[in-house]
Amino acid sequence: MEATRNLVSSSPSFQTKTHLKSSYSSPSSVVMLHDQTTTPVVNSRHLNSLSRHFPASVLSQEPREESRPLSHALRDDRTSQLTLERRQFDELVSSREDEKFEQQLLHSTGLWNLLISPLTSETKLPAVVSPLADAELCDVVALAQKALSASKQAALLVDDTEANPSDNIKDSLSTSSSMSLPEKGNIVRSKRQLERRAKNRRAPKSNDVDDEGYVPQKTSAKKKYKQGADNDDALQLFLWGPETKQLLTAKEEAELISHIQHLLKLEKVKTKLESQNGCEPTIGEWAEAMGISSPVLKSDIHRGRSSREKLITANLRLVVHIAKQYQNRGLNFQDLLQEGSMGLMKSVEKFKPQSGCRFATYAYWWIRQSIRKSIFQNSRTIRLPENVYMLLGKVSEARKTCVQEGNYRPSKEELAGHVGVSTEKLDKLLYNTRTPLSMQQPIWSDQDTTFQEITPDSGIETPTMSVGKQLMRNHVRNLLNVLSPKERRIIKLRFGIDGGKQRSLSEIGEIYGLSKERVRQLESRALYRLKQNMNSHGLHAYADLLV
């Protein structure tokens, strides 16, 4: 029984769940095992934990066998008193350590599944009790070696299980192992844990499911906003910040609007002072005009501006909802969001709480009006009036209706009938609302040929037309030879032939000293003679060249 008691007090590999952590977390337990084989010292902490699992017969035999050697020891009062005091002290210390260790295990959620399951299947305490009860002192060394091998196996299992654990489990293991080490004996610090931590820091963390079934939680909203936004995503940049996700209650909205109304009153007084004094008033003058102190004025201004910003930010999603309805109408999505924001800010200034509706209901129409107005003015190179846009919208709706009915290519007459206008007005509308193209725009995406390179210039005559006009001029000069010199000169001055400008009858009369009537008579007679000879010269071939 003496050997049994020494083995129980020294062997750390036959502990229960509460002391299983301290048995393999550090190699110091192995050092204590070899020290206690030579000098047996009872460790009350392990003895108390193991006594729970020993049979009652073994525990009852131990005091009977110990009574014989203790009967001689009781003669020395001093020795017995020291022994009792030491046992009481050890029991008190072990009870406190047990309570601390149990609290640590309760806070560490994954320790039982990680550490206890592989060891409880290999170490069965009741199976070891029977050989330990009859063991001799010579067998203590052999049993200690077995305990040492078991502790090494446990340490290897811990190394395998700690390959992919979280940092909090590692910290709890190291903390509990350091607290459960015995105070006596040499402590050997292992560097494996430091090496594993350094290796885990260098290794990239994966988001996949771990071996224990741990699934990482989704990133919270704040973490997502801290990660940054994509510069190309206009919607993400516009709704940047968690404030845009918060909805306001009716009470909060009424409070913010009251602060904004008070700020508008302050700004109105400031504008009045500017018009009176011709310059911007100071804070003191402004506060005196309002009948309040300067600190109170500053506080009201700050509160009003922050309330206005909060109200605008909370309704930005309404701007996005309305802007999406006007996409692909000539403005990109960013411009629609900006124009809608301007309408929202204007609605904040125009809103009256006495209207009896929520702010979002009132702001909807201001946002819509601002976006529509911007489309009318800026969506086209040539600005069109609003009524033309309304008519174009009706034409577009008529096309959609015809497609839904099965007519995928409606004629102009059918569209005019759906819209309620004439065909001529529809043609004029479609002609005036054509989208102009840039002459520098490439015709094909894979080539650099532009419209300017292939579009002919209507101001430049073709070689065929130029030669035809030259022949016509020579033919006309030959035809004028049938007239008298005076008539020929009057015709040339009257119609600007040979590069001259056209002259009036009075100007020609002044040149020849004739009246206007006489010049007209000469002109009529000359034209009549030309008509008589035109058929014989074949001038009808030049009819296409006359403009």
From Swiss-Prot:
Tissue: Expressed in seedling, accumulating progressively. Present in leaves but not in roots.
Residue numbers spanned by region Disordered: 1-28, 54-79, 163-226
Organelle targeting peptide span: 1-55
Pfam families recorded: Sigma70_r2, Sigma70_r3, Sigma70_r4
Chief location: plastid
Biased composition annotated in UniProt, kind: Basic and acidic residues: 62-79
Induction trigger: Induced by red light. Slightly induced by blue light.
Modified residues (Phosphothreonine): 249
Phenotype seen when the gene is deleted: Chlorophyll-defective seedlings with reduced levels of chloroplast-encoded transcripts (e.g. atpB, atpE and rbcL). Delayed light-dependent chloroplast development. Constitutive acclimation to light stress. Suppressor of FLU disruption phenotype; seedlings missing both FLU and SIGF do not bleach when grown under non-permissive dark/light conditions.
Source organism, top-level taxon: Eukaryota
Result for mutant: residue 249 to A: Reduced sigma factor activity upon phosphorylation but green seedlings
GO CC, one annotated term: plastid
Localisation: Plastid, Chloroplast
Functional description taken from the UniProt entry: Sigma factors are initiation factors that promote the attachment of plastid-encoded RNA polymerase (PEP) to specific initiation sites and are then released. Regulates transcription in chloroplast in a DG1-dependent manner. Involved in light-dependent chloroplast development. Required during early plant development and primary leaf formation.
Similarity section: Belongs to the sigma-70 factor family.
Protein name, as recorded: RNA polymerase sigma factor sigF, chloroplastic
Lineage: Eukaryota, Viridiplantae, Streptophyta, Embryophyta, Tracheophyta
Name of the gene: SIGF
